[in-house]
Amino acid sequence: MPGKKSPYGLFAGGKLKRKRQKFRWNDVTYKRKMLGLVEKYDPLEGAPMARGIVLEKVGVEARKPNAAVRKCVRVQLVKNGKVVTAFVPLDGSLNYINEHDEVVIERIGGPEGRSLGDIPGVRFKVIKVNGVSLWAIWRGKKQKPTR
């Protein structure tokens, strides 16, 4: 008579718990979380925002079925020197950003920390330029300070 695959009985709880914990490692999401792989390879190193210097302005072509050039900037982060591409939101906002400006970037909010919508490979967006909110500059509420 073949044995049972799972222990059962009054004192089997510990064994069942250990078995469950062992098999959790087969789950990719659990493994990434436990080994800290998200923070390890994250340019922001787990922080919600980061400061950086604009290296260049770039246009990223939108994915199908859209045909557009999404305005982005290449940013070198101050904290670790890594270079990332950040999307510049709002119509005509790229005109308020020059090379060597200091910007603050945050995650763009795509699924599972990835890129959003039709912008391939872009995981961040610009929220501040030289310490002033990009939205405030765009609305005309504040002047962009010159450095």
From Swiss-Prot:
Keywords: Ribonucleoprotein, Ribosomal protein, RNA-binding, rRNA-binding. Pfam families: Ribosom_S12_S23. Signal peptide: none annotated. The keyword Protein transport does not apply. CDD domains: Ribosomal_S23. One of its GO terms (biological process) is translation. One of its GO terms (cellular component) is ribosome. Transmembrane segments: none annotated. One of its GO terms (molecular function) is rRNA binding. Part of the 30S ribosomal subunit. With S4 and S5 plays an important role in translational accuracy. Located at the interface of the 30S and 50S subunits. Belongs to the universal ribosomal protein uS12 family. This is Small ribosomal subunit protein uS12.
